[in-house]
């Protein structure tokens, strides 16, 4: 079983970057692009909880992550020369290669002795990335690490994909002798690899002219370069796996999860998360949601909650957090920890801000 505990490491701070452009799902019309013919704006909002999203067809995940990281590093007054690693968790890298983390090392002005690596995960990605960063930091060999996580500029036409929004977050992790650290549980079910996927684009099904031919899928007109999701399969997976993972983590490490201050779940959709809350018998006041204003932001969704929903309550105050990410893969991860985290103000990035675009 994938349970483990990491001590002597802590989260020092969290920040987030989003596009300044806001798209309202109430303004979308049935039949536009991949919007289904029977699309009802109000019904969609009521079903998913997503009213509006931050969208950019220009800015990449690394652009938003760079903005978030710059803000966080400045707020923490970290000397960039002391940052030992940068981890980039995303399914929307700048290029097929090189790794986007390498580009961010240079763009952020980090040392050439810096460890840099990409992690190709989605909804569970922040928890996985956190486990890697904390593992590196716990020994003291790497003392400061920046974890950037998120997705943006997907292959689907952004304004016409009513569920997903663009965002990237930066999390600062450092070595801290004696820190209680983190308790993790992870799982994978690769038999559901096609529950959420882009069929063409990789080396298995390479891009060809036919990749852009529209076909009907789950009531939508789509092409093979867009995200295909088996809605009911994903819903069933989410409402089953997330509660089980939380309970397994608590049972394995012998703690009462009801005593935790905050429960931060991946922001998949409102109905799914409502059922998870009911299954775990949680106080809804302890389970913040950002879907209404930001949609599903993939691996950014958990840390984005800290920035956009509870910053004023938790900033620099010791709190107990239980976080669970679940989705594409199929993959899931849950983490429990207690800490006082500095939470930076949200960074809004304008499409026209040329300083956020990195050109080789």
Give residue spans per PLM region.
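Flexible, glycine-rich active-site loops centered on histidine and acidic residues
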Residues: 140-169
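Short beta-strand segments
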Residues: 12-15, 89, 120, 145-151, ...
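Condensing-enzyme catalytic core mediating Claisen C-C bond formation in acyl metabolism
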Residues: 1-58, 160-236, 240, 244, ...
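Claisen-condensing/thiolase-fold acyl-transfer catalytic domains that form or cleave C-C bonds
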Residues: 62, 66-69, 92-93, 106, ...
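Phosphate/pyrophosphate-binding loops at sites that engage ATP/ADP/AMP, CoA/4′-phosphopantetheine
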Residues: 68-84, 244-261, 309-314
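Short, high-confidence coil segments that cap the C-terminus of an alpha-helix
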Residues: 83, 142-145, 260, 318
């Amino acid at each position: 079983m994938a349970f483990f505990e990491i001590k002597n490491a802590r989260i020092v701070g969290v920040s987030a970057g989003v596009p300044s452009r806001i798209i309202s799902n109430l303004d979308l019309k049935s039949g536009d692009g991949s919007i289904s013919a029977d699309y009802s704006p109000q019904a969609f909002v009521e079903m998913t909880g997503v009213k509006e999203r931050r969208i950019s067809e220009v800015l990449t995940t690394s652009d938003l992550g760079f903005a978030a990281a710059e803000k966080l590093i400045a707020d923490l007054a970290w000397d960039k020369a002391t940052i030992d690693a940068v981890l980039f968790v995303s399914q929307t890298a700048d290029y097929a290669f090189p790794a986007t983390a390498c580009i961010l090392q240079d763009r952020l002005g980090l040392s050439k002795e810096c460890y840099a690596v990409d992690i190709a995960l989605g909804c569970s990605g922040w928890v996985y990335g956190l486990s890697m960063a904390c593992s590196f930091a716990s020994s003291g060999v790497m003392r400061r690490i920046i974890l950037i996580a998120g997705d943006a500029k997907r292959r689907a036409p952004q304004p016409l994909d009513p569920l997903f929004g663009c965002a990237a977050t930066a999390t600062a992790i450092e070595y801290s002798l004696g820190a209680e650290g983190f308790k993790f549980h992870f799982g994978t079910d690769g038999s559901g690899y096609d529950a959420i996927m882009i069929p063409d684009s990789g080396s298995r099904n390479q891009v060809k002219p036919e990749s852009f031919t529209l076909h009907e899928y789950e009531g939508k007109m789509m092409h093979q370069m867009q995200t295909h999701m088996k809605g009911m399969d994903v819903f069933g997976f989410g409402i089953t796996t997330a509660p089980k993972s939380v309970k397994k983590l608590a049972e394995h490490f012998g703690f009462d999860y009801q005593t935790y201050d905050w429960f931060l779940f991946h922001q998949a959709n409102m109905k799914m998360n409502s059922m998870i809350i009911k299954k775990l018998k949680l106080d809804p006041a302890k389970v913040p949601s950002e879907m209404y204003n930001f949609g599903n932001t993939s691996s950014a969704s958990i840390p984005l909650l800290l920035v956009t929903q509870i910053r004023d309550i938790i900033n620099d105050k010791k709190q107990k957090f239980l976080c669970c990410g679940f989705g594409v893969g199929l993959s899931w991860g849950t983490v429990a920890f207690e800490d006082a985290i500095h939470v930076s103000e949200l960074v809004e990035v304008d499409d026209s801000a040329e300083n956020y675009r990195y050109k080789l």
